[in-house]
Amino acid sequence: MIDNTKIRSLLEKGLAEFKLDSIGDLLLDFLLLLNKWNKTYNLTAIRDIETMVSKHLFDSLAILPWIKGNHIIDVGTGPGLPGIPLAIAKPDLQFVLLDSNGKKIRFLNEVKRQLNIKNIEPIQIRVENYHPNQGFDTVISRAFSSLEQMIKWTQHLVAQDGLWLAMKGRFPDTELVPIHQTYRVERYAVPGIEGERCCVLINNTNKE
């Protein structure tokens, strides 16, 4: 049995740190829907709903300060992470949520319908087969094993002056070695998560 009061309290405490108090109800609805679907469809390896609050919701919201532009794509979004929390926090931005897994896209379409989230577009396709009419201002992912792979498979998606955001744990020293583009690394803290977290911001411009 889920203690909604406890979950709401955890959410409110963390959201206060992000100064995002107003989105608690919608995030809770998303979390409960994710937990319900996860029991049948195995959308995420995390089963404990309290852990989902920090490792899914708060970790997603922590990269908000570095999002650029209005046209965003979350590649390998899975059950909408980080895309859904970001879209809830930024209803004025447009998010494409890309994944090749049918059950995850079905879940995202249900989230869009039930929660009436108008600024997301779930798309089921492999990233190499997706060719939009325009590039994205920000390409986000936490699905790739390395930064080099992320750039290789999403190069065609980023706008000329666009940005990649890669969510990482420890500082990715070795992953940064083969990167030809200019970049910076921002360390951040997540309520409820111990240990290092960092976001790699890679510009779509080569180093001189």
Curated annotation (Swiss-Prot):
HAMAP family according to UniProt: 16SrRNA_methyltr_G (MF_00074)
GO MF, any single term: rRNA (guanine-N7-)-methyltransferase activity
Residues of the signal peptide: none
UniProt name for this protein: Ribosomal RNA small subunit methyltransferase G
Main location (coarse class): cytoplasm
Record-level GO cellular component terms: cytosol
Species name: Legionella pneumophila subsp. pneumophila (strain Philadelphia 1 / ATCC 33152 / DSM 7513)
InterPro entries per record: rRNA_ssu_MeTfrase_G, SAM-dependent_MTases_sf
Binding site for S-adenosyl-L-methionine: 76, 81, 127-128, 142
Superkingdom of source: Bacteria
SUPFAM superfamilies named among the record's database cross-references: S-adenosyl-L-methionine-dependent methyltransferases (SSF53335)
Family: Belongs to the methyltransferase superfamily. RNA methyltransferase RsmG family.
Catalytic activity entry: guanosine(527) in 16S rRNA + S-adenosyl-L-methionine = N(7)-methylguanosine(527) in 16S rRNA + S-adenosyl-L-homocysteine
